[in-house]
Amino acid sequence: MLERLQAVEDRYEYLNEQLSDPNVISNATKLREYSKEQAQIEETVQTYRQYKQVTEQLADAKAMLEEKLDDDMYQMVKEELDELSERKAELEERLKILLLPKDPNDDKNVIVEIRGAAGGDEAQLFAADLYKMYHRYAEMQGWKTEVIEAHATELGGYKEIIFMVNGSGAYSKLKYENGAHRVQRVPQTESGGRIHTSTATVAVLPEAEEVEIDIHEKDIRVDTFASSGPGGQSVNTTMSAVRLTHLPTNTVVSCQDEKSQIKNKEKAMKVLRARIFDKVQQEAQAEYAESRKLAVGTGDRSERIRTYNFPQSRVTDHRIGLTLQKLEQVLQGKLDEIIDALVVADQSEAMKKAEE
């Protein structure tokens, strides 16, 4: 492990030198590439340097214990030794995690798609609850959200809502939300007070850059139509809504959120690119995913990952068996406790695999 860490530190120093080179500074592509790589390994390098410093302090403390010391001094050095040993062990564990292979998509912005599934009106209302939850979570993280497409219902739910989340590390956190979310509650329209079970599905796609997925104009059919609101009524008379069909994969994306046809097409292209990129990745990872069943689930969007039980004010994440009696807080966007636990479970599983 120490050899790998030293190699990472050497690379960090090399990148530092390159970023001061006038030839690199004048080359925008190289400058961006080197800056990004340096940022990705910075935490590893800083943690490794702390580890080396603590290791030296530990050696000094051990050497002092071998000298002739009075009782008070001996006790003081012994306490320092214990603290340093504990700190060294913590840093070792952190470094093991930092050396795990990174998901190349973790730093990307994301496109989130929420759809009401089983349960009719109640499922669509729950889809709206999930959108509000993620919107609030994004705000707490300092991320920006932007609605790309929304099919609202007259009751205030969503048949489907697609939105973008822009922010550092958005995919690294939100990727754990992929799957089917189940709600158990008494609908407002239920006179008998019976609990209904409904589901909504969440898809989290990393934003794909143009260089990552090559889509030819000739492969896209563009249709325009008038925007419509809840219930299907027309909300404007201009043909501003856009539907894109990627002919080779039969992937269809619509966008009518903007008044401008050009802006709707730009938003639709982002979703189209992300969906095709996701499809390519899913196919490439299918065989690997079969051999490595993640502790946090397969990521399959049909997999039930979480239940929100209103009568018991309970949220249960089925992938890691975590139950919290904090339903209201979770729906207010306080997802850190759940997502942090999923990250730890994922890292633990990855460490086991690395040690095999």
UniProtKB/Swiss-Prot annotation:
Cellular component GO terms, alphabetical: cytoplasm
The entry lists its GO molecular-function terms as: translation release factor activity, codon specific
Among PROSITE patterns, the record links this protein to: RF_PROK_I
According to the UniProt entry, which residues carry N5-methylglutamine? 233
Q: List the disulfide bonds.
A: none
A family per Pfam: PCRF
Q: Highest taxon of the source? A: Bacteria
Q: Which InterPro entries match?
A: PCRF, Pep_chain_release_fac_I, Pep_chain_release_fac_I_sf, Prokaryotic/Mito_RF, RF-1
PTM notes: Methylated by PrmC. Methylation increases the termination efficiency of RF1.
| Record keywords, A-Z | Cytoplasm, Methylation, Protein biosynthesis
Q: Which compartments does it reside in?
A: Cytoplasm
Which HAMAP family does the record cross-reference, listed alphabetically? Rel_fac_1 (MF_00093)
**What is its biological role?**
Peptide chain release factor 1 directs the termination of translation in response to the peptide chain termination codons UAG and UAA.
Q: Which family does it belong to?
A: Belongs to the prokaryotic/mitochondrial release factor family.
What is this protein called in UniProt?
A: Peptide chain release factor 1
What is the species of this protein?
A: Shouchella clausii (strain KSM-K16) (Alkalihalobacillus clausii)
